[in-house]
């Protein structure tokens, strides 16, 4: 895995995966799409979709644990703070050889810069929330969310997927 290349690719994902509008019905449709995809693949994950301050969708699939719910919360907090993918922030910290606690004073008990939370962006409004998955390895959590967003937004996932490591 090349960190610089992944960061460039994640930036392209964040630019491309923008909703024209977003409401609770769209959150429900996206959440159900993610649930069906995860179920078909046998993923034991938690799925979370929020606008900042309001939960819109949550599901814990068979095999997911309370730890997954806490990882969701901590990854979601990274997106809320930085308005960037939690994976991008984690890769930046890795590049810098620093932690969120060292560099930004953010406690690991509340912030986790691991892959799986992606900014929910609306055209003309910016980042309004996050879409998060937890239960797979961090790169796979990130790509699961991106794949679902591509399907929901009619984007070509193959063109936006991270390079295979």
Curated annotation (Swiss-Prot):
Could you tell me which Pfam families the record lists for this protein?
HbpS-like
Listed Gene3D superfamilies:
Haem-degrading domain
Highest rank taxon of the organism = Bacteria
Give the family this protein belongs to, as stated in its UniProt record. Belongs to the UPF0303 family.
For this entry, the protein name equals: UPF0303 protein Bamb_1459
Q: Which organism is it from?
A: Burkholderia ambifaria (strain ATCC BAA-244 / DSM 16087 / CCUG 44356 / LMG 19182 / AMMD) (Burkholderia cepacia (strain AMMD))
> Species lineage, top-down?
Bacteria, Pseudomonadati, Pseudomonadota, Betaproteobacteria, Burkholderiales
